[in-house]
Amino acid sequence: MADEGKSYNEHDDRVSFPQRRKKGRGPFRWKSGEGNRRSGRGGSSVRSSRLEDDDRDVAMSDVQDAPRVRYTPYAARPNRRGDNWNERTRIHVTLPLRRDRSAAERGGAGTSQDGTSKNWFKITIPYGRKYDKSWLLNVIQSKCSVPFTPIEFHYENTRAQFFVEDASTASALKAVNYKILDRENRRISIIINSSSPPHSVQNELKPEQVEQLKLIMSKRYDGSQQALDLKGLRSDPDLVAQNIDVVLNRRSCMAATLRIIEENIPELLSLNLSNNKLYRLDDLSSIVQKAPNLKILNLSGNELKSERELDKIKGLKLEELWLDGNTLCDTFRDQSTYISAVRERFPKLLRLDGHELPPPIAFDVEAPTTLPPCKGSYFGTETLKNLVLHFLQQYYAVYDSGDRQRLLDAYHDGACCSLSIPFTPQNPARSNLAEYFKDSRNVKKLKDPTLRFRLLKHTRLNVVAFLNELPKTQHDINSFVVDISAQTSTLLCFSVNGVFKEVDGKSRDSLRAFTRTFVAVPASNSGLCIVNDELFVRNASADEIQRAFAMPAPTPSSSPVPTLSPEQQEMLQAFSTQSGMNLEWSQKCLQDNNWDYTRSAQAFTHLKAKGEIPEVAFMK
């Protein structure tokens, strides 16, 4: 392909094309049917100096993550020596701007194609690289009071950055600063800086230029092979004659090209992008969605330096790839390592740089199956269910009250207790679980038997004293899933999974998930007495955070029926009998529906069908 010097515009049958018949069907689907628009637009007088200039310098000014020129037009170089945490996470909004300076001097204003002036702002999320782009933008949009369109989203070192184009949007994003918690319960910082217009806006092709590009691409398309040849596109004679500068390593030009492909030939099978001075493939990444059937891709003669660039298009199911002439080809010690690295991204590849590859080693792997959903609590019998739920309700009412000393009666004289948190290779003492670290008895991390023994809390006095030192909490009773794993006439073992919120200290309002395993024996008051208590605490997942405290638990009261009229008390008794819920939850349901019995019954039926009424509501 590349080594034969083949050019698709040598074919005579590509000058005119059939009209687009149906989206995604037919040999060619160009919308453009206009005649030659080039008359009167430059004729034969060509600015040859444009092509004689150094292409590399022009292109490099638009490559945001190229070395030495990463978005330097948009912000001053930070003072690394005097940098500190507060300065790096502080919001910077330079509003209002001085009116005695021109837009060019301020660097924050631009002009749209309709002549209106716009202010541009660069949005920076420190350490944003660790977040998925879709998740990050969606969560910011959900908290932002103004809908916004992120322009040129990209990662810069450890930061995530994008641009917005007006002051009201920037102010709304400023208000979101530190309002978002990530999956590790860390607050996300958002920094706003005034900025010059992003390159994709500065170099955006005009509508008439896009139409000309579409016509030229149609001439380079071979409908019989569903192949598009964009080799050395900037030097195309028709583009030069029209004085249209299409540099494919500019985000705006690549975006326009891919948009034309998506709208006209999404069934494309072969694409030649050789000799276009491509330094990175960020802007090509959307081709995975816009031309999902692509099988042949020619990237030879470009300036790709790292194999990691291929990760950005590895969603393509390529069978043939050309990379020769790129610096990355020289970074491998031998041919087999090169083939292996490429095939890691494209496992179905059959030809590389024109050479046949040995058949890929494949395994018969069963189709992925979805794990069954987690079931609810398991109690074994109704008697055990009532016993355990009553115990948990009493236990966590005291545990969350702020005075855990009253838990002494819940523990056996010889009880023992331990705590553990997840093992992480990073320094856990500096994580947001740091308050639990010193008492963690994670045996995967802890090898010293003496220390293991010391971290076990023995006797009920030591156990309750230890529990008093842990952060104050509020548990979401509705999140509890209880499983009874063992039961004899003299012993009961059960586990509780759920979420809680810390209500004071450095991690106030942080959500945690926990698993707690109790081993208990019968108590003299027909209740339970704990002999072993094992607590595991971790950060709550995104789903757990979203579901937490969705249905507030009723406030415990000393009287189940406080100050109700005789009619309300009669209604409450009837509703409790028919629904099966206890008086406390029945009253809550009636109150939430303004004591309308019919509405309350409908709400109860609806929530019960969805499984959103907790077990404790039925404990009498």
From Swiss-Prot:
GO terms for biological process: mRNA export from nucleus; poly(A)+ mRNA export from nucleus. It is found in: Nucleus, Nucleoplasm; Nucleus speckle; Cytoplasm; Nucleus. The modification Omega-N-methylarginine is found at R41. InterPro entries: Leu-rich_rpt, LRR_dom_sf, NTF2-like_dom_sf, NTF2_dom, Nuclear_transport_factor_2_euk, Nucleotide-bd_a/b_plait_sf, NXF_fam, RBD_domain_sf. LRR repeats lie at residues 267-292, 293-316, 317-344, 345-372. Residues 19-28 have a biased composition (Basic residues). Residues 1-88 are annotated as: Disordered. Transmembrane segments: none annotated. Residues 60-119 are annotated as: Major non-specific RNA-binding. Involved in the nuclear export of mRNA species bearing retroviral constitutive transport elements (CTE) and in the export of mRNA from the nucleus to the cytoplasm (TAP/NFX1 pathway). The NXF1-NXT1 heterodimer is involved in the export of HSP70 mRNA in conjunction with ALYREF/THOC4 and THOC5 components of the TREX complex. ALYREF/THOC4-bound mRNA is thought to be transferred to the NXF1-NXT1 heterodimer for export. Heterodimer (via NTF2 domain) with NXT1. The formation of NXF1-NXT1 heterodimers is required for the NXF1-mediated nuclear mRNA export. Forms a complex with RANBP2/NUP358, NXT1 and RANGAP1. Associates with the exon junction complex (EJC) and with the transcription/export (TREX) complex. Found in a mRNA complex with UPF3A and UPF3B. Found in a post-splicing complex with RBM8A, UPF1, UPF2, UPF3A, UPF3B and RNPS1. This is Nuclear RNA export factor 1. It comes from Bos taurus. The lineage of its organism: Eukaryota, Metazoa, Chordata, Craniata, Vertebrata.
